[in-house]
Amino acid sequence: MHFDLTSRSLEDQQQTVATALDLGGRHIDVGQSPDEEHVVLADPEGNEFCVIEPGNAFLADCGFLGALASDGPPPVGYFWSAALGWPLVWDQDQETAIRSPRGGPKITWGGPPQEAKDGKNRLHLDVAPAVDGDQRAEVDRLIGLGARRIDIGQGDVSWVVMADPGGNEFCVLTPQ
């Protein structure tokens, strides 16, 4: 899971990259081809993110944080669309994306994982039922959509750790 940051111009993209490098980021190679226009970086803790080229139509109206991108086949996108009640805004070429009806960044999935999973996810989503909601009912609803409970060694905690159909961990919190 990583962030896609957008750019208004080539200079803006270069400035975002320079700022990230000044803050301890570094260039990384994830198999991108030399002719790709986006820049792949990692933050000081090794979390990947991309600085997308200007003029990217897919992320054009999403804001600076264009997307939260993750590996995963189409069923993962279908699951999250149903789980969050957000419309599927892209379903093409083994890639899916959802977006809040209110706008903002997209959440995207595309293809199989590029690297084998090693331990728990470094980044994950938290789902919080409404204040008057019920955690158990939300867990049951998500299981009905294709999620499953998992144990990652969390012990006795107030949240429930689950995995989506692609094996990505997420937590269901107590009502907030």
Where are these regions (language model features)?
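Hydrophobic "anchor" residues on beta-strands that sit immediately upstream
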Residues: 160
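Short, small/polar residue-rich loop motifs at catalytic or cofactor-binding pockets
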Residues: 34-36, 155-157
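Glyoxalase I/VOC metalloenzyme domain signal
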Residues: 1-29, 42-93, 98-151, 163-176
